[in-house]
Amino acid sequence: MTAWQKIQKIAPAAIGACLFVLSIGAINSELHHYGWQNVLASFQGIVKTRLAGAFALMLINYIILTGYDTLAMFYLGQSLPLTKTSFVGFVSYAISNSVGLALLSGSAIRYRLYQSWQVSAPIIAQAIAFCNLSFWVGLLTVGGITFVVDPLQLPAFLHLPFLSVHPIGFTFLAIIGIYLLITGNLIKPFKIGQWQTPKIPFAVSLAQIGLTAVDWILASGILYVLLPGHHHLSFPGFFGIYLLAQVAGIISNVPGGLGVFETVVLFLLTPKYSSVQVLGALLAYRVIYYWIPLGSASLSLGAFELLQHRRERRQKSGSESE
């Protein structure tokens, strides 16, 4: 392995680690300034109806998330029951959202579960690729429209060649435009190195976009309802901030975007809200959107493995008695 290959291998993890440290430092500075007690008081002061609303949105959101695997199996012509594809979708997303390296962790969970139901390895690989593609297709579409229609202004100290996310939005939409032209058979698929554009029906592509759009709207709605007094900021204005923060968290590869996501949200929302209010809402959001589903999914996966182990033991003892 050459020196350049070694750098390419460790660079993403190193960048993610640096972003994590810097983000935690920024949050720690805010906590030191305002105090943990004030943040916890702000968390406890969130109206119960808002907490209930956020919890309801989380439940609906994770139901929507199961649609990725259901759509993947439909596209691949597999006849797995809805209960199984929904179980795979919930467990894989609830765990990968929190542990980070979503491509690796989510793929490993999908492989384990689908393999236990005798789904072939090539089909599993295609399902994994389809789910990951759906995520990015939806993100680029929703992000592109949001950044073009309601462009978020970027702080001057970043010294970027543009002052708003407008160019990012147009870039996102250009990529999606090419994708839809390919799936609509208006231009031929092409290859970039070993990668070839997938042959997905146009209707399925639209379903990918619709599914992911609902997913992102619901996920952002969880944090939005936890913020006090929405007269400060409209939902469309907040949505752009949420998307930008999530993209930063995804790029960092930090588990659940921990620290990176919060830092971006904190920085962009503090002109509208106090830091204590934002940190309190972020704490509630992480508990509701990440920790509760993570706990439920971990228990569900553990129960599944236990049942599988018992079933295999019964089958083994039955074959030996024969």
Swiss-Prot record:
GO terms for cellular component: plasma membrane. InterPro entries: L-PG_synthase/AglD. The keyword Transmembrane helix applies. Pfam families: LPG_synthase_TM (PF03706). The chain crosses the membrane at residues 7-27, 54-74, 87-107, 128-148, 162-182, 209-229, 249-269, 287-307. Keywords: Cell membrane, Membrane, Transmembrane, Transmembrane helix. It is found in: Cell membrane. It comes from the Bacteria. It is a multi-pass membrane protein. To E.coli YbhN. This is Uncharacterized protein slr0712.
